[in-house]
Each structure stands twice: as C-alpha cells, then as structure tokens.
Swiss-Prot record:
InterPro entries registered for this protein in UniProt: Glycg_phsphrylas, Glyco_trans_35, Pyridoxal_P_attach_site
Name recorded for this polypeptide: Glycogen phosphorylase
Catalytic activity, reaction form: [(1->4)-alpha-D-glucosyl](n) + phosphate = [(1->4)-alpha-D-glucosyl](n-1) + alpha-D-glucose 1-phosphate
Gene giving rise to this polypeptide: glgP
Residues making up the signal peptide according to the UniProt record: none
Cofactor(s) annotated in UniProt: pyridoxal 5'-phosphate
Domain of life: Bacteria
Modification type N6-(pyridoxal phosphate)lysine: residues: 662
Length: 813
C-alpha cells in the first residue's frame, strides 16, 4: 500500500485514531460514544487508503490502460471496516491499538450497518468480484446506485414478514466521498423530434423531457496486500429544479418539494414492488438512470486522454451483470449516433465490442421484458434505437434463414402478440461480444434452451465463467479460528491462491488435526448458540446438527421442501421414534414484497418453529429458527458454525449459487441437488463427501408434461400426512385455511418446482446425514475434504477467467 507498514506501530496507530476523535468527530476520548470511535477509526482507515487510491487512479491514466466497468443493480458489500483493515494488513494492529485505548474492537464493528446496496447472490457476487479485481490489480470500476433505503429491513410479526425502510445511511457512510463535480443529466419521457442536417443526415432530438441529475459517490475498494485501490461509483438521483421557493411562499408546501421527491424516488429503494404499474415504471427508470450516468462517465474518462473515439473499444470493456443494465447498449448507441454523430455501423461495431453480458437465470419471471407501451412512454428515443437495432438484426436473420418466420420470432428483440414486449435478454445477446453463464451446467443449459437459436448464429459468443467467492471475507474474516489453524498447518498462500487448500487433504487422516478441526466447529457453534438465545430467545444445543438454509426466499430454492421435511421428523418425534439425531434447523432470507407465496412460506416456517420449539417432546431433539433480516454480516456468523448446508433448488433452476461455496469453504457438508455449481463442487470435492439427492434436470424435463403430484400422495401416505399437518400448522386464532394455498400449489397447481417429486429422496438423504453425524470422526474427515476441494471456487479464479477470455485485460498482481 502507499504507506510504509514498517513505520506504523501500535503507538502511531493510537495517535492517528485519537487525532480523528478530536478533529474528525470533535469529541474527547471520554465523551466519545462507541459510534464516534467507529467513525474515527473508519476515517483513519480512509485516510490511509487515500494516497493509494489517488496513486492507483493516476497510474491508470499514465499507462493508458484498458479499463473494465462492472455495472450492476446490486453490490451486497456487507460491512467494510474489518475487510478494509485485512486487505491493508492492519487488522491486528488496529485491534491492539484500540484495546490499549480501552475500546472493544468487536463492539465498534457492530456499529457499522451493512451497506444497503443489494439483496441476494447477484449483489454478493458483484462485491466478491470487486475485491478480486482490486486484489489482482485489474483496472476496474464498479457502477451501481446509491439506494437511500436498500431493499428493506425484514421484521417478523406474528410469523409474517413485515418490511420497513433499511436506514443504513442514518448515521452517514464513512467510506463514501461525494463527487459533486460529476453530475450528469438523465432524460425521461418527452417526444422525439426528427430533422435533416446539412449533410442530409437524420438528426433525432428528445424534447419536452424530464431531466434528473445523477450525483456520483465513490467508495474505495482496496486489494489484498497490494498497492491497488479501485473505485465503486454509486449514483444518487437529484432534482434539476430542487426546492421551489415560489410555491412554498404561496403555501403550496407539497408542490414546493414535489420535484425533489419524484427525482429522489429513483434511488430510494432497490427493486420497488413491480406487481403494480407504478413500480414497473420506477424500475425501468432506475435501470436507465444507472446506465445513462455510467456511460456518460465512461466516455468522460476516455475522452480525457483521447481526442477521437477510434480506440474506445480497445480501452473500454463493460460487463453487464444480468439484464438490468442491458439498456446500456441502447444508451451507448444513442450517445455515439445522436451526440457524437458516428455512422450507425461504426457505432454498432464499437458498442458490440465493448459490452459483455452475464446471464444469471433461465427463470421466465427473472428475464426482463418491458411492455412497449411503458417503454415508449419513458424512453421514446431508445425505443426507436432498439427498433433500428432489431430491424438490422432481423435482416441478417432472414439472410441466414430465408422464409423462416419462427426463427425471426425467436431471435427478435421485440415480442409480437396482443401485447408487445421488449426482450432485454435478446438485446443483451445481440449487442455484446461475449455471453457467459455462471457454472458449467448453467452455461450448457442456456445454450441448449434459452439461447439455443442464438448459439446457432453466434457459436463462439457463449462461454462459461463459474462463479467464485473471496476467501478473504468468507474465511479469513468470518472464521478466525479455522483460518488460524490453516495458517499454522499449510501456510497463508491460500488467501490469494485458493487451490493451496488442497494441502489440507493429507491432514484428514491425522487424528490430532481432526480433533482440532472438530473443536473449532463446536466453538463456532457455541458462539452462534449464544447469539441465537440472546437475539431470538431460542435455546439450541451446540452438539446438535446445525442445518442451515439461508438465502433469498423463492419457491425454486425450495425452503418449502425443507420445512415439509422438518414437519415429517417432528411427526416421527411425536410418534416416539428413538432414531432422531438432535438437529437445529436455521432459516434466513427475505421474500420480495409482492411475492405472496414466498411470504406465506415464511409464515409456515415460523408457525412450525413456534409449535416445535414449544413441544416438550421435541425439546432435546429438534429446534427451528427463522432468523429475521438475513444479511452479509449475519451470514458471516452463521456459516462458520454450520454442519449441513442446504442447496436444494429444483434441478435446472439455480444458475450457480455461491452460498454453497461459502459453506464448503468453512467445512460444512452439502445436501443438495445436481444443480448449478453443486455439480462442479461434486467433481472437485467428491460426490462421496456430499449428500446428493433428487431428480436430474433432464428427468424433470421429461416428467414435466405428465407430472401428477396427487399420485405421489396417493402412493405415499407419509407425504399425505405431512400435507395434512401443513393445514394444521395454523395457530388457534388463525384462519383454518391459512396454509391451503400452499397445499393447493403442490396438489392442484402442478407443483411447478417438483417439491413432492423430490421429497422422498430428500428425506432419505437426511437419514444419511443423521447416520454420518453419529460418527464424528468420519464427519470431520469429510469436512476437511470439503475445504480441501473447494479451491477452484475462488472469485480470484473467476476474475482471471473474465480478464483472459472476455475483457482482454492484464492483471498487475
């Protein structure tokens, strides 16, 4: 880093922190609150990073490097203090300095709110990638939105999810810097006026539009143990007009701030509820706001050192993290053609060389389609551009497949019918250089299904880059005990080359090493047990299986199947079974505000937890916990204490998953389907060290048209009994039909996620889990094998693949 570590000692660290207490938060050590001290430490760390940050950015200009721009609606960063200190190499030093000053470092860490910039795996992947790009010295920038209230805070009231604003910015964000000099206009609505210029060229001008300003906020991203500090730039929406003083003076106080409110709504929350038309419109505005400000900024940075746009595609590579930023393709064409007056073909060639697209799903509801009516209202010029892109594209399609209207329909950006839609995934494929899936299985699946027709046209465009995770946060930070054991046993090289973890496999036969390993897991479980009791009031047994299912609540992730399994084992306990192995089942995750079935599943989990946890028969055998407001910092506490990782999505529906990797990295065993990255994990770790169950994707595809879930119940009385108990899981004062929609979903609506089809196999897999857990030596061996085999799944390896195979950029570390 830019500072000399040899000159920093505990005393100089103490002085630096105290100086920030006096001059930064304007307190004395005696009057400062814990939050004041946290802010002082964070500001001290920021100052240490500042010179390195400036040096990094200057070097990018001086060397005229090709830059990578990673655009994402989400960056699920978690907390930054410990992560930044670890990467700077100052974690232990700061801890010691604070201890000398009489402050508890762990208490300070708790003062930091998780950054409200993401929700699920998409955002956490983006955060891991930022860490790896900086660690590898890649000239990269993240671009996202600065949400005032994040996704939402989740409370549980009477078993139901209740959403409230995530006030993550209430006390400010000590890591961000407002860049007021970077303020870009973004235009919505209006109408397009066409005219002819002196050269006979058509000129399009958007008139009568609504203008909103994009204000830049920068967050530093330090690499691990190197001199790189990259930037995450976040945009906040602001009104062009601001406070309307004349309205205020006439008593119209609402109108005086109306423009401010309407503009600010764009970056108010992540993913506004799109089950209503207003929410759909706001989402579209969010996505365009992000790409418009970002592309204006990219071009500003490029033109700072280049007089023409001739080398734009040689100096810029843009990665679209899912379809949310795919509008960037149309925006780049808008700027190059309308403002820079490039010839269409030149602009299109440049654009398609710059952009690349990561697909994260094949689920129809997650593949964005915008109604033509909405799109034409909000972005009229961009609709014209997309029509032109599509017309030229379909001309090529017709040349390759003359007279094949089915092929034209399949490959068109515009979906025809009684209602017309713009297919953003198709735009993303047509307008990019490379399209990648995020696991080998998923990449093959999108080539065989979703983008099959495109693969025929662009056989070399589709590649795979399997997802990964950063071992710095997910092992060194979150599991200090295990990382300390690894450091003593195999060295620290695994922190930057995770494949070095394979050295631990040879130690699996060492009984002394296994004993240490097992002891660490128990200590982590004891810590988590204490926290569960403190925060949730549930007493759990740290000697039980800690069985964790923590991720976004969605039917395809099958939390429902898990709670049906819990009901089955609870029934076994009530019937006097003596073969139940004590188990603590931990759920966590948020449901989208408009997703009624997911929210009802949360209610079912909480009702079952209430019933089970209050039954004396189950006291020592089964506990169920739903941990509200699942977030990165909570995952960092749960994952190191987990014995069993639930990765049970319907085969073919989870693109990759990264939670599976985090659990395995911390020594948990996986129970899962052959889906997403589970398949590659089985190859690297060994299928024998996992609990694989369920139908394969091809079996589900074959079964889909003739699947009859009622027949499963008819043939299997214990499954029918489970469903009967679901209906009885209501509490005394609740509607007797409360959970009827869940049973209807399974029996009368075709069980679209094949819960009942896989349930028997899932129960059998859990029986295998229970048998192995009663053999702690064997369980611990498999735990070690999981850690030893997970080395491929580093985000450093993922980013190296992107850099080599997609971006064509070099790394300096």
């Amino acid at each position: 880093m830019h500072f000399d570590r040899m000159k920093i000692n505990v005393e100089s660290m103490k002085q630096a922190i105290l100086e920030r207490v006096y001059c930064g938060v304007v307190q004395t050590p005696q009057s400062a609150s814990t939050r004041d001290i946290f802010t002082a430490v964070a500001k001290t760390v920021s100052e240490w990073m500042a010179k390195g940050w400036l040096k990094t950015q200057s070097s990018y200009y001086d060397n005229d490097v090709k830059r990578v721009y990673y655009i994402s609606m989400e960056f699920l960063l978690g907390r930054s203090l410990k992560s930044n200190l670890l990467n700077l190499g100052l974690l232990d030093l700061v801890n010691e300095a604070l201890s000398d000053l009489g402050y508890d470092f762990d208490q300070l860490v708790e003062m930091e709110h998780d950054a409200g910039l993401g929700n699920g795996g998409l955002g956490r992947l983006a955060a891991c990638f930022l860490d790896s790009m900086a660690t590898l010295g890649i000239p990269a920038y993240g671009y996202g939105l600065r949400y005032d209230y994040g996704i939402f805070d989740q409370q549980i009231e009477n078993g139901y999810q209740v959403e409230s604003p995530d006030e993550w910015l209430r006390y400010g964000n000590p890591w961000e810097i407002c860049r007021g000099e970077y303020l870009y206009p973004v235009h919505f609505y209006g109408k397009v006026k066409h005219s002819m210029d002196s050269r006979g060229r058509d000129v399009a001008e958007l008139v009568d539009s609504q203008e909103v300003l994009a204000m830049a906020y920068d967050v530093p991203v330090p690499g691990f143990n190197n001199d790189t500090v990259n930037s995450l730039r976040l945009w906040q929406a602001q009104s062009r007009h601001g406070f309307e003083f004349s309205y205020f003076n006439h008593g119209n106080y609402i109108r005086a701030i109306e423009d401010i409110a309407l503009a600010s709504n764009i970056t108010r929350v992540l993913y506004p509820n799109d089950s209503i038309s207003e929410g759909q419109e706001l989402r579209l505005k969010q996505e365009y706001f992000l790409v418009s400000a970002t592309i204006q900024d990219i071009l500003r940075r490029y033109t700072k050192t280049h007089l023409s746009l001739d080398k734009l595609s040689e100096k810029v590579s843009v990665q679209l993290n899912d379809t949310h930023p795919a509008l960037g393709i149309a925006e780049m064409m808008h700027i190059l053609v309308d403002r820079e007056e490039l010839d269409w073909d030149v602009a299109w060639d440049t654009t398609t060389k710059i952009f690349n697209y990561t697909n994260h799903t094949i689920l129809p509801e997650a593949l964005e389609r915008w109604s033509l009516d909405l799109f034409s209202k909000v972005l009229p010029r961009h609709l014209e551009i997309i029509y032109e892109i599509n017309a030229r594209w379909l001309k090529k399609v017709s040349q390759k497949y003359p007279g094949d209207d089915d092929k034209r329909r399949a490959l068109s950006i515009i979906e025809e019918g009684s209602s017309k839609f713009i297919n953003m995934a198709n735009l993303a494929v047509i307008g990019t250089s490379k399209v990648n899936g995020v696991s080998s299985f998923h990449s093959q699946l999108i080539k065989n299904t979703l983008f099959k027709d495109f693969v025929e046209f662009f056989p070399d465009k589709f590649i795979n880059v399997t997802n990964g995770i950063t071992p710095r946060r997910w092992l060194a930070l979150s599991n200090k005990r295990l990382s300390a054991l690894l450091n003593r046993s195999i060295g620290t090289d695994y922190l930057t080359n995770l494949t070095h973890l394979n050295k631990v496999i040879s130690l699996a036969e060492d009984s002394g090493f296994r004993e240490e390993w097992h002891k660490i897991k128990i200590q982590n479980k004891e810590d988590l047990s204490a926290r569960i009791y403190k925060e949730l009031g549930v007493s759990v047994n740290p000697q039980s299986i800690f069985d964790c299912h923590i991720k976004r609540i969605h039917e395809y992730k099958r939390q429902l199947m898990n709670i049906l399994r819990v009901i089955y084992f609870y029934n076994e306990i009530r019937n006097g079974s003596t073969e139940i192995v004590p188990t603590t089942v931990i759920f966590g995750g948020k449901a989208a505000p408009g997703y009624a079935m997911a929210k009802l599943i949360i209610k079912l989990i909480n009702n079952v937890a209430h019933i089970v946890n209050n039954d004396p028969k189950a006291k020592d055998l089964l506990k169920v916990v739903f941990w509200p407001n699942y977030r990165v910092s909570l995952a960092e506490a749960i994952i190191p204490a987990t014995d069993l990782s639930e990765q049970i999505s319907t085969a073919g529906m989870e693109a990759s998953g990264t939670g599976n990797m985090k659990f395995a990295l911390n020594g948990a065993l996986t129970i899962g389907t052959m889906d997403g990255a589970n398949i590659e994990m089985a190859e690297h770790i060994g299928k024998e060290h996992m609990f694989i169950f369920g139908l394969l994707e091809e079996e589900i595809s074959a079964l889909r048209n003739e699947y009859y879930p009622q027949g499963i119940c008819n043939a299997n009385p214990k499954i029918q009994e489970i469903l009967d108990m679901v209906l009885q899981a209501r509490l005394p004062e609740e509607d007797k039909d409360l959970f009827k929609p869940i049973v209807n979903r399974l029996l009368n609506e075709g069980d679209p996620f094949f819960v009942l089809a896989d349930l028997e196999s899932y129960l059998d897999a859990h029986n295998r889990v229970a048998r192995l857990f009663t053999q702690p030596e064997e369980w611990t061996k498999k735990s070690i094998y999981n850690v030893g085999g997970i080395g491929f799944f580093s985000s450093d390896r993922s980013i190296t693949d992107y850099a080599s195979n997609i971006w064509n950029v070099s790394q300096s570390s």
